[in-house]
Structures are given as C-alpha cells and as structure tokens.
C-alpha cells in the first residue's frame, strides 16, 4: 500500500506500546490485527517488563520512555501466551538457586513474584497448569513493574495512558484482556 507507507515515511504515531514474547508462534501484530504504524512493539523472552532502573535492562526502559514521552502512546498492553518456554523455564528454576543458564534464567527471574504467588496459591496443580497460571500472573507483575517508571505513573494519573494485561491461548484460540486497579492517585507521585 504505497499511500500507507508514504504516510509512515513521515513519522509514526502509534496508540499502543505492546510487550510480547519473542516466541515465533505469537506475533502481536497478527494477534491484535495491527497494521504498520499502529503499535510500538517490544518483544523479549516471556514478555517481561523489568522495573525502572537506569542501568539494568535499559533497553526496555528506553522503549517505554520513548513510547510514553515521545510517541505519546495511549495504551500499554502486556501480552502473555500459552505454552511459553520462558515461563516454563521460570517455573523450573530450582529452589536451591542452582543456575542453569547465563542470560535466560537471569531475565526470567523478573517473574519470580509471579512464580511465588502461583506456587503459594495453586501448588496442588499439575506443572502445565501451574505454568498457565504463571503466564497470566507474570503479566500482572509486568504491569506492576510499569508503575515503577515515573513517566508511566504520571501519564496514568493524568488519564493520558491505560495499562492492560492480556493472555493469548493459541492452542484453544482464546484471548483474554484485563485491567488491574492499582489505586493510582496524585499523592503517589510525590
């Protein structure tokens, strides 16, 4: 479409920042039916959003900052998915702390609060079901981590931004979308 790409050559103004997994089976533009220019997309193992830190994980922080402050996206969506290898890896990390990899394990440990919550509340489930619960809970952890970014909190308080969690079950063809009520108020910005 020459007209579309002619417009895109002039710049971008996406309404969405999407965090999605690097998994080749789950393309966020396909899942959400986005056309070029409609979403600023960050993909990584297990669709993790790290907490605010100007040194560690600065690539993710730079993408969030650019999307919120410069592109002025109106929505941030974190999408988890079924059969996520990153979450399976997180759930498989030995409790004794024995490292199994150099990079992957350190990255997925961002989701340890999700693993802890799932194991505490659902430990009677089979491993695959625990992983499914953790896929969704890790999205919630990432949504919480987004609140550690001052410019995200500011945009939320000023009603210029919304946060949504999602889970795509590609095996059963289901897509769940949710909001979390964080109780953000102007007093939290001080």
Curated annotation (Swiss-Prot):
It is an enzyme of class 4 (lyase). SMART domains: Pro_CA. GO terms for cellular component: cytoplasm. Its EC number is 4.2.1.1. GO terms for molecular function: carbonate dehydratase activity; zinc ion binding. GO terms for biological process: carbon utilization. InterPro entries: Beta_CA_cladeB, Carbonic_anhydrase, Carbonic_anhydrase_CS, Carbonic_anhydrase_sf. Keywords: Cytoplasm, Lyase, Zinc. It is found in: Cytoplasm. Reversible hydration of carbon dioxide. Homohexamer. Possesses a transit-like peptide, but it is proposed that this peptide is not removed and that therefore the enzyme stays in the cytoplasm instead of going to the chloroplast. PANTHER family: BETA CARBONIC ANHYDRASE 4, CARBONIC ANHYDRASE. Belongs to the beta-class carbonic anhydrase family. This is Carbonic anhydrase 2.
